[in-house]
């Protein structure tokens, strides 16, 4: 019998959620996603030392200012890891903008353009890159600008329907609604486990997927942040799913039928008028889980970015 991973691939584009090139090569995903936490983790892998050294060398050639060198090294390290990953995936790499720019549209656009230039200078074309931005109002506006410049974006840390709707209305290429982190919040609040079919994260992504397909939005839905393979299998049929190596391993070892749960209806329902800033903030604010998890996610990515910078500063 074929494995669940093999069956899932027939229904959904499988993406690897890791910066570990060895793990990516093992599971042959279409794309890969990274974030500040995963870049920090990757930077601690011994085999990646030459990438860090090359990034430091680049930064020193750009500036004599230590703080600027740290910034440039971190950016180039993310790009260098991305370049290595692109040698083993046929599709795209997602590289994230500094989380500390999550409420700064202009700063996010500038950083995204800089990352794209670094990739382009290395011979990597835009159609192989997704720029990751937090799904704040400012991040969504940055994505709207970048998409018009031919820079496709992956809007991450997405927890509320308001965020999903605003992303679709801005014409962003792809969203990453978080499944496991939503479930974490409800599990802590209600003190119980959830069956995969009633998992609040699964329910959230299913609702977003159906809304997009019913209204004919082209934005790709890529479920992310999974805690178990039950959540993944409940979203079989989703456009894409980004999965950590340990869960890819579980899927590869599991057999049994994988049933398509999400189906594209190719709908053409009338779309509502685009949300205003005030409407977005109000609707998002009605979801306590989303407010808490978005803020926490940004803080945690910023902490890991700081750790990476400290690690780099010690090497300069």
Swiss-Prot record:
One of its GO terms (molecular function) is transaldolase activity. GO terms for cellular component: cytosol. It is an enzyme of class 2 (transferase). Keywords: Cytoplasm, Pentose shunt, Schiff base, Transferase. This is Transaldolase. One of its GO terms (biological process) is carbohydrate metabolic process. Transaldolase is important for the balance of metabolites in the pentose-phosphate pathway. NCBIfam families: PRK12346.1, talAB. The active site is at 132 (schiff-base intermediate with substrate). The lineage of its organism: Bacteria, Pseudomonadati, Pseudomonadota, Gammaproteobacteria, Vibrionales. It comes from the Bacteria. Pfam families: TAL_FSA.
């Amino acid at each position: 019998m074929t494995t669940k991973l093999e069956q899932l691939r027939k229904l959904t584009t499988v993406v690897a959620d890791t910066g570990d090139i060895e793990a990516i090569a093992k599971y042959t995903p279409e794309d890969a996603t990274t974030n500040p936490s995963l870049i920090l983790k990757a930077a601690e892998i011994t085999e990646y030392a030459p990438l860090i050294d090359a990034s430091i060398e680049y930064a020193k050639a750009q500036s004599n200012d230590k703080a600027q060198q740290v910034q440039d090294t971190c950016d180039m390290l993310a790009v260098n890891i991305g370049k290595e990953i692109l040698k083993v995936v046929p599709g795209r790499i997602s590289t994230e903008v500094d989380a500390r720019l999550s409420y700064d549209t202009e700063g996010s656009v500038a950083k995204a353009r800089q990352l794209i230039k670094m990739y382009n200078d290395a011979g990597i074309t835009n159609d192989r890159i997704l720029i990751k931005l937090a799904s704040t109002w400012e991040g969504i506006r940055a994505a709207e600008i970048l998409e018009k410049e031919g820079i496709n974006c992956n809007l991450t840390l997405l927890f509320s329907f308001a965020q999903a709707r605003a992303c679709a209305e801005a014409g962003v290429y792809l969203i990453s609604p978080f499944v496991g982190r939503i479930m974490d919040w409800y599990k802590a609040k209600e003190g119980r486990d959830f069956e995969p079919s009633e998992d609040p994260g699964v329910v959230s992504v299913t609702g977003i997927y159906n809304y997009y397909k019913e209204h004919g939005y082209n934005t790709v839905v890529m479920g992310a942040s999974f805690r178990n393979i039950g959540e993944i299998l409940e979203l079989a049929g989703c456009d894409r799913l980004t999965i950590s190596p340990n869960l890819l391993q579980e899927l590869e070892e599991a057999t049994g039928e994988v049933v398509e749960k999400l189906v594209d209806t190719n709908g053409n329902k009338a779309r509502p008028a685009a949300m205003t800033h005030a409407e977005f903030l109000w609707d998002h604010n009605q979801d306590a889980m989303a407010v808490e998890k978005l803020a926490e996610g940004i803080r945690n990515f910023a902490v890991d970015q700081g750790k990476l910078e400290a690690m780099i500063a010690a090497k300069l």
